[in-house]
Amino acid sequence: MTAVAMITGAGRGMGLACAEALAERADLLVLADRDETGATAAAARLGAAGTRAEPFVVDVTDPAGIADLTGYLAAQGDLRWVAHAAGISPTMADWRTIVNVDLIGTARLLEALRPLAGPGAATVVFASMAPLLDPNPPDPAALAVLDDPLRTDFLDRLRNVLGAEVEQPGIAYSWAKRGVQRLVWREAVRLGAAGARICSISPGMIDTPQGRQEAREHTSMRALVERTPLGREGRPEEIAAVVGFALSEAASFLNGTDLLVDGGVVAAMRAGVDGRR
């Protein structure tokens, strides 16, 4: 049976790097992206290198689109590897859209893919270091709301428990990514019964078009690079290498955890030191 890898957000940045990292492993790469031009260009680039890659246009906030994607994947063969890199950052949208894409869309996608997960299948979902930078423990009442993202009134409940603060895109992004990390904990229990695995990955400051946009608009992003002990941004291929490992047989006992790949900036901030000292 055809061994299939599916990568969301595959048109550029870390998603494209993940597709390239999985190219030699899979018989077929399904490159899912909202941007048809990006997905098609990525498929052509990989195809020129001898990889069978097919673009698939999907918006993770669209239930019908996700249903079409899962139907397509089921018809292609055995879905062995999933890298869900699609998402948006604080400068790209209002708070409701950020949560809808980054958390609700992720929850909806994982729910739809669950029946396709068989023994040995593995998934990596992109979260972020953002919630790990918050020095304050999260409110348990907020976490209780956060853990039920598919409720029809989820956004209103989140606004009620967090207050007006969540309307700041950066705050909304951090909470959405915290929700992704916690979603993976629960999904690991469900998938484990089928012999499948799932982890999240939390990148730090990475040199991508999206990351550069954030850095241009927020000086705090540039400050985080300066505090990174390794003294630089990460590269998309460095994130993809970790994703590739987490999806491999070498990581067959890795399940339900978050992989922080940030050059040490969270460690430096928790230690209360300048990362370059």
Residue ranges of model-derived segments:
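Short, flexible catalytic-loop segment of classical short-chain dehydrogenase/reductase
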Residues: 203-213
